[in-house]
Every structure is written in structure tokens, then in C-alpha cells.
């Protein structure tokens, strides 16, 4: 197929091809079938397709709106229907070039695209495969309109992965990137969820996730938020970090926890000390494995009841398949004494 794509590229780039001829050929049906080719496993083929589509968008001005709509529909199909789409990274590359050309202030349709596509693409299970391109699009949008950073953080916290440590690390990196441009007038509404997520990541059994979460305490803006909103931050962060500083099994991370604990204590010692005794602290982050097992079993029983009721109400209903099963569940807390570990081949 590559010679065919090369021929199409030459036709599109040829100066003697009249615009009206291209308009007749480049229809909605053509674009729909063309975008389906991005499903190819072969990366060089997808690269050819990307270059052709980019050239078409640049040359065929009357069809730009249609091309954007068809690409958006492809993204929506991935978000709401599919688990994986091999050409997502290439389409995001094209979108990055398009976003760079958006005028400021952004039009309403562009803001809607950011919220319904760019933010929503984070929740796709295979997002790790195109995360670099997605991050580039996100930051380009935010450079055009910094107020969108709040919506991005809300989306990251809402779609935070729970069974994919590589994806979780990338989410932390993106959250770190966007932190400095958050709108100061709207940041307070995000803080409880933000601090809780950081605390969860610090207590993660995966070392890379925990280490990445600790880098937030090297960020001056993040520390300024803790100082300014210490009544919110310390009751959430102090109990978790204090316990891990005493019990974490990894020596280097334990040293980092001790350093962070001292930073939090220096911010306001009385508030820090009272936070360790505060009954409203997020104890679910530091529960023992027996308590966590009981909580998990109660939730699984609840889901089983809901599943049974759904099947009684709608026979033949197709239930979603979770991205994990009990056989691959390794740990519920940070520690080596978990008696619920199951190893399989």
C-alpha cells in the first residue's frame, strides 16, 4: 500500500490540481474510509496517512471543518466505544499543528473540543500509548487559554488510573506540568481532591509512582499552596507521610518521606501535630490489610447485587468487563505483610 500512498501524496501536493476537483473527491465518505485506515498496526503506513491528511487539511481550506468533524468523531468512537485505536497518536500530532494555528481568544467550538476530546481521551485504557502527543495538545490549548488548566486537572483527577502504574506515573508528570499555570482564583476548589490524590500516590506500592508523587514537594508553587491552605493540606498529607516515614520498606523512599515530614512540620507545627490525631484524616490510605479486605469485599458484594438486579431487569444485558481480576490483584496497601497476594503464571 505504501506506493499507493506515495502516489496520493504526489497528487495532493501537485500544484496543477484544481481545488474544485479535490472538493469533489474529498467527501465525507472518503474521509470516513480514509480515517479507518489509521487502524493499521504498521507504523510507517500510519505515518504516510498522517502526512497525507495533514497536507489535505493545509491545502483544502473548504473541507477543514469537515476534516475536524470527522477526526473528532473518530476520537469520540475511541472514548466511548473502543478500547484501542492504533492511529490515535498520529491524529493527535495533526491536531497539535491545528491547535497551534488557533486564534486567541479560543472559539467556543475549540473549548468544547478540549473538554470533550482532549480531556476525555485521558480515560481511555490505552491512553499510555499516545500520552506524549496528548500532553502536547493539552499544553498547547492551555498556552492559548490558561483557564483551561483547571478543567484539565479536574479531568485528570476524575479519570485517574487505579490499576496501571505506568499510566499513573504519566498522569503525575502531566499534573506536575500543569500545576504552575493553575488559575489562582479557582485553585481552592481543587485542593481537597488534589491533596488526596497525591497522598494516595505517595502510599502507592509501586516505587516509581511514590517517587514521582514526592517530586511535588520540590515544586515551590505546590509548597506555597500547602502553606496557604495548610488547614486543608496537612490533615490529608501529614498522617500518611508520617506513617510511611516510620514504616516504609524502601530505604531511599523512607529517607525522602522523613524529609517531607519535616517540611510539613516546619510549615506549622501545631497544625501538623493536631493533624496526626484528627479523626477526619484520610484513614483509608493507611488501614491494615484486614480492614482493606473487608471494605473491598463489601464493595464487590454491592456490585454483585447491582449486576444481578440489572440482569433481572434487562435479560441479556452486556456488562462491562473490568480491567483486572482477583488473580492479578497484588496489593491494597504499602507493605510486604499482605496475606492476600495471589501469584499466577
PLM features: what roles do these ranges have?
Residues 20, 46, 64-68, 83, ...:
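Structured alpha-helical bundle/scaffold domains in large eukaryotic membrane-trafficking regulators
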Residues 4-15, 34-37, 52-61, 74-79, ...:
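Hydrophobic residues within the alpha-helices of tandem HEAT/HEAT-like
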Residues 200-201, 234-345:
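Eukaryotic acidic, Ser/Thr-rich intrinsically disordered low-complexity regions
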Residues 41-42, 84, 127, 163-164, ...:
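Short inter-helical turns and helix N-cap capping residues of alpha-solenoid HEAT/ARM repeat scaffolds
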Residues 1, 15-17, 30:
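Internal amphipathic alpha-helical repeat/solenoid segments
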